Amino acid sequence: MKEVREAGIYEVMADEACFNLDDARRLIDLQACDWINIKLLKSGGLSEARRIANLCKDSGMKVSVGSMLESPHGVIASMKLAHEIAPHLVHDLDAGWWYPSTLLTYVDGKVSTP
């Protein structure tokens, strides 16, 4: 990842390379990426995800929140974290299409709750 980043052609986002706070520290220390994408399920929940997000912000690392086909309730938790840490950025918040739910509404690429 670092070699691609240093080539300077593209910004590099760490996604599957970051599962926890130690992974985030390593990526930041190595300057291996420009962004870290946090997923609540992958990181062990909201508390650890928030710790990763705060480390990224304190280190000047861009951070976004993604989802892994969570239920609508999981996406709502991810939405709250995304709004808390970087409301101006694009995040990847999608629920599985097979969940029949009125908890989330997607309009023009934006997710909201009723």
Where do the model's predicted regions map?
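Active-site-adjacent beta->alpha loops and helix N-cap segments on the catalytic face
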Residues: M1-E6, L21-A24, G44-L55, G74
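Glycine-enriched alpha-helix->loop->beta-strand junction motifs that scaffold or abut catalytic
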Residues: E3-V12, I28-N37, L55-K62, A82-L89
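A cross-family glycoside hydrolase active-site/sugar-binding cleft signature
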Residues: M13-E16, K39, S64-G66, D92
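Short, composition-biased local secondary-structure segments
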Residues: E16-I28
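Active-site-proximal loop/turn and secondary-structure-junction residues that shape catalytic pockets
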Residues: C18-N20, L40-G44, L69-S71, W97
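Short, flexible micro-motifs
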Residues: D34, S47-E48, L69, A77
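A polyampholytic, Gly/Pro-enriched intrinsically disordered region
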Residues: D34-L40, K110-P114
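Flexible C-terminal active-site loop/helix
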Residues: M68-P114
